[in-house]
């Protein structure tokens, strides 16, 4: 479980929003795409800031489902907090393609409405991601350098 960091008193709304985001990220990690699909609102906006933006929960779930068996995903949530329906995460993500593991930090913003995610916006440093890629490539030759969560 992640460390819970809050700036306002915990309310049922903040607790529900945090749990919805945790359940979504865990389902994504476990390739439980039925749960992923159910977690995303129809009007979802999914954005990797500086890169792509996808509108629609079904479109996003379809994209994620297409990666099943091709791109693995692992997540470690370092901190998570909420203010009402807005949830902020500080985490490390790993993308796994065959033997290649690319691990990097991510800050995510989620908005939850009626238990479903309507906004998923991730911020990450491209240079940090590039370092993760380089480390992953070197680890293919020197396995002891493989990153772990």
Swiss-Prot record:
SUPFAM superfamilies: NTF2-like. This is Epoxide hydrolase EphG. The keyword Thylakoid does not apply. Pfam families: LEH. GO terms for molecular function: cholesterol-5,6-oxide hydrolase activity; epoxide hydrolase activity. The active site is at 93 (proton donor), 122 (proton acceptor). Homodimer. Is also present as monomer in solution. Its EC number is 3.3.2.10, 3.3.2.11. One of its GO terms (cellular component) is plasma membrane. Is inhibited by the anti-epileptic drug valpromide (Ki value of about 100 uM). It is an enzyme of class 3 (hydrolase). Disulfide bonds: none annotated. The gene is ephG.
């Amino acid at each position: 479980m992640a460390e819970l960091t809050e700036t306002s008193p915990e309310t049922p709304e903040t607790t529900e929003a945090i749990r919805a985001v945790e359940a979504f990220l865990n389902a994504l990690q476990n390739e439980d795409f039925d749960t992923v699909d159910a977690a995303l609102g129809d009007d979802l906006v999914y954005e990797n800031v500086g890169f792509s933006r996808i509108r629609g929960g079904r479109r996003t779930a379809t994209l994620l489902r297409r990666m099943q068996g091709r791109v693995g995903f692992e997540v470690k949530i370092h901190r998570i907090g909420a203010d009402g329906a807005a949830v902020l995460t500080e985490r490390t993500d790993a993308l796994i393609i065959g033997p290649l593991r690319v691990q990097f930090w991510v800050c995510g913003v989620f908005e939850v409405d009626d238990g479903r995610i309507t906004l998923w916006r991730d911020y990450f440093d491209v240079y940090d991601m590039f370092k993760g890629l380089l480390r992953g490539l070197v680890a293919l030759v020197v396995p002891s350098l493989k990153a772990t969560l």
